[in-house]
């Protein structure tokens, strides 16, 4: 009888220990999730920045990678990628290097095509059009004979100029992940077509699907901050072996090269 009571007591202690341990793990995981969200929120707070020249006066994260006196360079990049069945993958993107030292900005508008040749080897073709920014306007630095293309470049807007994540904390059922070995971290959310940012993308791009996208926010490097790390957003509308439709955007602060 005494042996039976001791056995029951031991079992209760074991169950209690497991329960306490599980609670501790859950608390630790929740703490890491919170840290990841806080890290992303620092970047997302930059959206929207309607006037790109405001980046001349915006300070980013600095570490030992920066030379003394280097104010740093903001790199903004937006890209729309469409690959339909039995068609070439085509992307149209623009990247700007916003130099805080010289208060000048230059970059490229890039048209990229990817396809497989008759032997199944991947082939690609990039066409770059150099640009500069003055008074928040994109200006091609070389003559472009194609009026439609020239207007597309001059009227280009980066996602940071119109995207808005003020409701990011209301996004539900996010899948937060962290890999300490890289380190890398991400947060993924299923959006609806009524989402503000989705509406803005559809307004500006010909997106050949009615499917609502998933939003993936990902980064790498030290969670506390790193100029070596990289963060970007990805709105994936379609992703399979035959078709891919997605939009990517990034804002990163780096030492000036």
From Swiss-Prot:
Location of the protein in the cell: Cell membrane
Q: Which UniProt keywords apply?
A: Cell membrane, Lipoprotein, Membrane, Palmitate, Signal
Q: Where is the lipid attached (N-palmitoyl cysteine)?
A: 23
Describe its membrane topology.
Lipid-anchor
Q: Lipid moiety-binding region for S-diacylglycerol cysteine?
A: 23
Q: In which domain of life is the source organism classified?
A: Bacteria
Stored Pfam families = DUF576
Q: Where does the signal peptide begin and end?
A: 1-22
**What's the chief localization of this chain?**
membrane
Per the record, its GO cellular-component terms are: plasma membrane
The text of the family note is:
Belongs to the staphylococcal tandem lipoprotein family.
**What is the protein name given in its UniProt record?**
Uncharacterized lipoprotein SAR2573
Q: Which organism is it from?
A: Staphylococcus aureus (strain MRSA252)
